[in-house]
């Protein structure tokens, strides 16, 4: 399973320093310095095209930090090919750029299937970047220790985090929150999360998201209202980013965290969406989850605005509407077209394309296409994809049934612990011989090794993407 099985068997804080450096490049370097502010501001509001254009102008003049800015955008696409390019860019700049050291370290922490050598390289880079004054290094370092304890047998993550806390490092508290999330003890430590994040709120705006989560889980509307008031004031002053406001709004609209406050979420998103296009899609998702907030015309307006800003989540959600046929008439061809535009940037796009091809929604079953997309989705962390692959191999629609591969993917799907997955795994295991089961378990382990050992937590992705201040970039 390491390879794909066949279907029948897939502003300028650095301005003065840069002007001095520009003497060795060209006077145009100083003339181009305002572009760094344009790039930073564009990136903060989600306008990656403008950011990329301005970073490119500086990168062409030889500015390593601008090259790192371009790599940041590549990482943000979630496209494996672009992430590979970003890794090479970070690595080339790491000798002279502490920021590149931190970025490369974080990228290696989040890299699926990273080698033990890469784990230790990440540790060294993050420690070096921390010593050079870079922020957002202890959180990914904590994730490294938590995610790959076998690579660091002499490191106790909790003890290390406690040492950081005793030393007074600002990131240490959030590293503790990360430990709670990773070890699934977050709900047992809500009071501690609140204490940590209230203390860090003025310097670390991701704490707005954590506190909003805590107050939703605690059903504490008074505390939540005070937090939102403080956040909106910070947003007006420019100390809280639109990305954070968007994230908090999505917490408010998440019914799995407690009683949702969808109307407040909608009001927050509508305030920031004109300057932060990703929020148009968050608004559409909110309307999808709470249809009473609007109608299909409102939904299409939100999605059109998101698509105009090249937001892949907009293509994904529009594809879902045509796939499900709830808001608009079902149209598998239209769904396919929108999902294809989101492929490489939204993992779920591969999942839905795989389901279209597996279920024959285009008039017939396309088993190899289905497998290719579903396997990509599964390897990128889409929870339901393994179950769909097990169904593909066991049902034999459009292809010959393959009991061994069906068993392998049913075992992988069983990790999701849903009744359907457990039932299918039990059903597919029964007719196999002991030898076949042993072979299947070897293939399961091989596939797990291909994917990496753990799914990425939301906080880990923050650790990869998070920038303390958009102005820091250059």
Each language-model region and where it sits:
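Bacterial N-terminal signal peptides
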Residues: 18-28
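Structural signature of tandem alpha-helical TPR/SEL1-like repeats
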Residues: 46-50, 78-89, 114-125, 149-159, ...
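Bacterial signal peptide processing site
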Residues: 31-33
């Amino acid at each position: 399973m390491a390879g794909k099985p066949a279907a029948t068997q897939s502003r300028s804080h650095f301005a003065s320093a840069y002007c001095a450096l520009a003497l060795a490049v060209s006077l145009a370097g100083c003339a181009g310095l305002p572009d760094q502010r344009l790039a930073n501001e564009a990136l903060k509001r989600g306008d990656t095209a403008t950011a990329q254009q301005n970073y490119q102008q500086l990168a062409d003049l030889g500015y390593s930090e601008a090259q790192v800015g371009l790599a940041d955008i590549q990482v943000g696409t979630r496209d494996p090919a672009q992430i590979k390019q970003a890794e090479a860019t970070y690595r080339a700049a790491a000798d002279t750029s502490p920021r590149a050291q931190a970025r490369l370290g974080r990228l290696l922490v989040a890299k699926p299937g990273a080698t033990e050598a890469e784990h230790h390289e990440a540790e060294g880079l993050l420690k070096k970047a921390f010593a050079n004054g870079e922020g957002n290094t202890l959180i990914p370092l904590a994730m490294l220790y938590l995610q790959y304890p076998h690579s660091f047998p002499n490191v106790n993550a909790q003890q290390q985090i406690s040492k950081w806390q005793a030393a007074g490092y600002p990131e240490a508290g959030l590293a503790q929150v990360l430990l709670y999330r990773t070890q699934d003890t977050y709900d047992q430590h809500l009071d501690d999360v609140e204490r940590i994040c209230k203390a860090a709120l003025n310097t670390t705006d991701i704490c707005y998201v954590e506190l909003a989560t805590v107050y939703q889980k605690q059903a504490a509307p008074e505390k939540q209202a005070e937090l939102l008031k403080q956040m909106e004031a910070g947003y007006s002053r420019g100390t809280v980013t639109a990305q954070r406001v968007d994230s908090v709004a999505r917490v408010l609209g998440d019914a799995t965290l407690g009683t949702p406050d969808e109307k407040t979420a909608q009001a927050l998103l509508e305030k920031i969406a004109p300057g932060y296009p990703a929020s148009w899609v968050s608004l559409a998702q909110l309307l999808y989850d709470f249809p009473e907030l609007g109608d299909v015309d409102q939904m299409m307006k939100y999605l059109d605005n998101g698509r105009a800003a090249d937001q892949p989540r907009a293509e994904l959600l529009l594809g879902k509407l045509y796939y499900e046929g709830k808001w608009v008439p079902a149209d598998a061809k239209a769904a396919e077209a929108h999902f294809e535009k989101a492929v490489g940037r939204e993992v779920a796009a591969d999942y839905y394309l795989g389901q279209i091809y597996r279920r024959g929604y285009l008039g017939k079953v396309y088993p190899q296409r289905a497998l290719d997309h579903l396997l990509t989705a599964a390897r990128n962390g889409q929870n339901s994809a393994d179950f769909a692959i097990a169904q593909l191999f066991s049902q034999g629609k459009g292809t010959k049934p393959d009991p061994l591969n069906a068993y392998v993917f049913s075992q992988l799907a069983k990790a999701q612990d849903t009744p359907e997955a457990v039932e299918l795994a039990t059903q597919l295991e029964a007719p196999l011989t002991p030898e076949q089961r042993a072979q299947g378990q070897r293939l399961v382990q091989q596939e797990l090794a291909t994917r990496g050992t753990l799914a990425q937590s939301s906080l880990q992705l923050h650790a990869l993407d998070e920038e303390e201040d958009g102005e820091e970039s250059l």
